[in-house]
Amino acid sequence: MTHVLPLAGLAALAAFPAAAGETACWFENGVVVVPAEVLGVAADFILDTATAHTQLAETQAQTAGFEETALTGEVRLAGLNLAGATVAVADLDMRTGALPTPVAGVIGADLLKPYVLDVSFAPCRVRLSLRGRAPRFPARTRLKLTWVAGRPAVDATVSDGEHTITGAFAPGVGADRAIRISDATAHVEGAAKPKELYPYGILEPRLRTLSFGGEVSEDVTGGLIAAEDPQLAGEIGAPFLSRYRLRFDFPAGRLLLAPSR
């Protein structure tokens, strides 16, 4: 599949279109990707509300002449200039290798937190609004957002039929599995290659139910994620969230869900 978005998106960054604060994106291989400019590196970036810190890929950082692993500068995203951004340099080869076009990093929750973020998956569009300036959103469900380990989190319940886990899950538009559970609270017995249960692995165990936003979904693709905080039960990824239109109202502490178009 051929994508023309990167060129169009970067042109939009330079021109600042009338719909300031909004940009086209693309959704493939389970993640949302947006055009952005991070510390002068203009490229495609994964947008992920479940990643705590914004990252620039090691290869792109070296090409741009950066030697440090912790950087500070300007990020341009969806027509907005985000000054004073802290960006970590990281090896992202495993995370970006399966994507059909080069990706230079990850826009994380730290940059998004001051804004209202709207995400639609079909067609894929992202909008950032200042507090109190977001357009009307036809929410069907409103969920409380808390913050755990630098990530937004909502309550959800997952079950394999024998065991049930209820806790705080980070909703991630750049997370590539419907749900991943912290390995501090779950494991898969008898897995021949347990590492393949983690991000970028090939195993896709099925979970019987996921209760989220007042609805129960069955036969959900799952996996594990390395524990980072005992209060974080896991993450809910874009393959599941794409059934909705989303509004992350970070200033108000709410996640709003609307039916997909």
Where do the PLM segments sit?
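Positively charged n-region of N-terminal signal peptides that target proteins for export
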Residues: 1-4
